[in-house]
């Protein structure tokens, strides 16, 4: 049976842990609010950009015009999956869920492509796939440290250049899509070639006057679209990470409080037993006299 000193030490240790998890929960809650605001502000712009591109591509296809290289379909032999994870842990199943989701995607598409490589954003994804001897072509570091649109733009530019050079035939983006503070949905979306199949059925029947031209707009908007897809994935992942960490720390804090209550009860019982024993010894000694 542990001594009173041992129990007191454990209670102090658990209390220190509770202070840490409670502080981390509060920090994550503050970061979540900012990240959630950024996601909600980005979604309408991304959706409108998708609709505009779909309309432009649909009209170009209807008039049998030459499509932009980022739209033109081609034989897909090689692919790359850009996996967005976090640099830090203590976020529940946030990282493991998306990594396992990507593993299933690789298995399901093994016959579709001759070769599928990985590019990781975040230390946890790199560690996960490296431990399983999966090929990692590129590890993007320092993106989460100071999240900025310019970093997403640089990543998108590199992916676009490799696609146009024929080094890869398809690029996918895997990330946790933010639903709520306690819910994230794993997603793998096609980044390149740009998918405009979301165009509505009556899009081809509606046209606008474009200046300077439809082709010039496509050439300008397509790179923006790719960069926006990457930026949105980074923001969605950041919000999901903070939500997952907040939930994990809330659960850890609750468990710590329950453990403190259990240890306190154990301490009181042990102390009561110790006092009873001391009293019994005193009474026995008095009777002996």
UniProtKB/Swiss-Prot annotation:
This is ATP synthase gamma chain. PROSITE patterns: ATPASE_GAMMA. Pfam families: ATP-synt. Belongs to the ATPase gamma chain family. SUPFAM superfamilies: ATP synthase (F1-ATPase), gamma subunit (SSF52943). Keywords: ATP synthesis, Cell inner membrane, Cell membrane, CF(1), Hydrogen ion transport, Ion transport, Membrane, Transport. GO terms for molecular function: ATP binding; proton-transporting ATP synthase activity, rotational mechanism. One of its GO terms (cellular component) is proton-transporting ATP synthase complex. One of its GO terms (biological process) is proton motive force-driven plasma membrane ATP synthesis. It comes from Anaeromyxobacter dehalogenans (strain 2CP-C). Transmembrane segments: none annotated. Produces ATP from ADP in the presence of a proton gradient across the membrane. The gamma chain is believed to be important in regulating ATPase activity and the flow of protons through the CF(0) complex. It is found in: Cell inner membrane. It is a peripheral membrane protein.
